[in-house]
């Protein structure tokens, strides 16, 4: 989201439905740069872990995630600039991609339960591109599985990208002076956001405080995870109907 820091933290607390193990937040300000915090949530609730840290978060843009897989956000310094990234991903060829990146003299600094952190792997694929869009398209090209993501950049904007087959949702919400991107629109009514629209498969947008810029148009194919139709219990998409 792009909003005051208290709003970033409070808003994030309404989006903890699809994960239970780890929670992470990252904000950006010109004064202090990126600030990140990650906690284990297996024995407690999201709010109790982060409420004592509110004062350390600065800036009016932030991203966060509740994950059952990787410790995230990951913060990367690259030729594209510094950025923080969170992903909702399931990569079936992760070992193959790991070996390929290691053969290119890449290295992995973040491990999750002694395994490669797939969010870091995705970030390494992104920085192989000349731009963020080219890098995200590189992710789509190489992974087998699915990946939706949010990137928080040094200009305070947020890049949102939906999985190229639309398997997991990304919805944009708006209010008077803020935009938000999330996987679950159920949080918006409590926070006075209105649904702006759902991203299409493979669509990439950039969120600012007062507008959204489309960076990549959506594709034609849609292979939504059928579980989500039951999980959310509502009509989620106005884009093309699911198909095999």
Spans of features found by a protein language model:
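Conserved short alpha-helical segments that host acidic/polar catalytic motifs at enzyme active sites
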Residues: 2-6, 10-200, 206-239
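A short, hydrophobic C-terminal helix/tail in secreted or cell-surface proteins
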Residues: 240-244
């Amino acid at each position: 989201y792009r909003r005051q820091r208290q709003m970033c933290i409070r808003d994030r607390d309404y989006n903890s439905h699809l994960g239970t193990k780890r929670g992470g937040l990252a904000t950006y300000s010109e004064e202090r740069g990126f600030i990140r915090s990650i906690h284990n949530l297996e024995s407690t609730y999201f709010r109790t872990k982060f409420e004592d840290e509110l004062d350390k978060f600065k800036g009016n843009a932030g991203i966060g995630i509740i994950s059952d897989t990787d410790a995230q956000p990951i913060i990367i310094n690259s030729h594209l600039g510094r950025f923080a990234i969170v992903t909702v991903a399931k990569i079936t060829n992760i070992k193959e991609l790991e070996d390929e990146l290691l053969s290119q003299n890449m290295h992995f600094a973040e491990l999750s339960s002694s395994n490669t952190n797939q969010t870091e792997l995705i970030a390494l694929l992104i920085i192989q591109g000349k731009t963020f869009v080219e890098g995200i398209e590189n992710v789509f090209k190489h992974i087998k599985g699915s990946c939706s993501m949010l990137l928080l950049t040094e200009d305070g904007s947020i890049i949102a990208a939906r999985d190229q087959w639309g398997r997991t949702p990304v919805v944009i919400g708006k209010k008077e002076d803020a935009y938000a991107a999330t996987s679950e629109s159920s949080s918006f009514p409590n926070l006075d956001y209105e649904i702006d629209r759902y991203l299409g498969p493979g669509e990439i947008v950039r969120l600012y405080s007062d507008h959204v810029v489309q960076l990549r148009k959506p594709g034609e194919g849609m292979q939504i995870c059928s579980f989500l139709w039951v999980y959310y219990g509502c009509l989620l998409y106005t884009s093309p109907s699911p198909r095999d």
